[in-house]
A protein has these predicted regions:
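An N-terminal hydrophobic leader/cap segment in hydrolases
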Residues: 6-69
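Conserved alpha/beta-hydrolase
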Residues: 108-130
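Alpha/beta-hydrolase active-site loop
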Residues: 134-155
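Hydrolase active-site cap/lid region
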Residues: 174-230
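Short alpha-helix in the alpha/beta-hydrolase fold that links the catalytic acid
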Residues: 236, 245, 259-268
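Short beta-strand/loop motif that positions the catalytic acidic residue
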Residues: 242-244, 249-251, 255
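Acidic catalytic loop of the alpha/beta-hydrolase fold
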Residues: 253-258, 285-286
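Catalytic active-site module of serine/aspartate enzymes centered on a nucleophile-bearing elbow/loop
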Residues: 290-307
Length: 307
């Protein structure tokens, strides 16, 4: 009897650890947070005078609420910003526990000024989109494919760009390795991680001081048990090897969350399709607001070639 009690206690502790790891990595408790609630750090304070007015302008722009249903039955929401009928479309995908109005405060304006319509999506578990599990791009790539289908059904085969920041960048890079319609002409990836497993291990070890070899297997198993997905099912660094779509990859060299070398490893994996640029002094997801002129020039040159 005592042995059964001990075994039950061990099993309960193990399941608790799995669920703790799952909640830590894959759940978001504040999906409707204000865009102005971005982290207050020495890096963000430097760009605040540029970032806050850009967010405000984005929030004031007219839009249409849109939604689709994901392959696994979730309602996914977004905003559509119309410039002109028949114009190229840019689908914008924000980052992990991020806010699209922060991540695309600059890119939205670049697209608008270039005459592109914009479809700004809320990733699953974020904003008004349903879901309980963030999967670091593993299932989100299927969501982006669903948005592409929605856009083609609604707008026809207009030229299309995919644009992602942080986890959104990793997502669109994983999409790049899938079978895409011919009207997807280019992909912009801003500060992506090279693999879901690598960014989680980096955060656990470097940022949180946890024993990676002990905690990461629990997190991965928790994702499989409670989230029904496998962190190792795909990665940006592998997906780009299967891609034949032009890719623009931008990374700040002062990115302390997703280190710059991760961008370098992705670029090295597919040099024939990836154009890689570094923004000096830029923090994570702050490339545009750190150097708007250079960022605008890089994106404009790339999109003009693609479209």
């Amino acid at each position: 009897m005592l042995m059964l009690i001990l075994l039950a206690a061990v099993l309960a502790a193990f399941l608790y650890a799995l669920h703790f790891g799952y909640k830590l990595a894959f759940q978001y408790e504040d999906p409707l947070a204000s865009p102005y609630n971005y982290p207050d750090t020495d890096q963000t304070r430097k760009v605040k005078p540029v970032l806050d007015p850009a967010i405000a302008a984005f929030l004031e722009a007219p839009y249409e609420d849109v939604s689709i249903t994901s392959h696994d039955g979730l309602k996914l929401t977004g905003r559509y910003y119309h410039v002109s009928d028949g114009a190229p479309l840019e689908i914008q995908c924000h980052g992990y526990k991020g806010n699209p109005f922060v991540d695309f405060a600059g890119a939205w304006r670049i697209a608008k000024n270039a005459g592109r319509n914009v479809l700004l999506i809320n990733q699953r578990c974020h904003g008004g989109s349903e879901g309980h599990t963030i999967t670091f791009g593993i299932l989100e790539k299927q969501d982006v494919m669903a948005w592409i289908t929605y856009a083609n059904n609604r707008f026809g085969q207009v030229p299309m760009l995919l644009n992602g920041v942080s986890m959104g960048a990793a997502t669109v890079l994983m999409v790049s390795g899938m079978e895409l319609p011919d009207n997807v002409k280019g992909i912009i990836a801003d500060c992506p991680y090279d693999a879901p497993s690598n960014i989680i291990k980096k955060v656990l070890g470097q940022d949180m001081g946890m024993p990676v070899k002990l905690v990461y297997p629990l997190i991965r198993l928790g994702g499989m048990l409670y989230g029904k997905f496998n962190l190792n099912a795909d990665s940006p660094v592998e997906a780009v090897k299967r891609s034949n779509v032009p890719i623009l990859l931008i990374h700040g060299d002062d990115d302390r969350f997703v280190p710059h070398p991760m961008g370098c490893s992705i670029a090295a994996a597919a040099p024939e399709t990836i154009e890689f640029h570094t923004i000096a002094g830029a923090a994570h997801a702050m490339n545009y607001v750190t150097d708007p002129e250079s960022y605008r020039a890089i994106v404009t040159a790339f999109t003009e070639r693609c479209l």
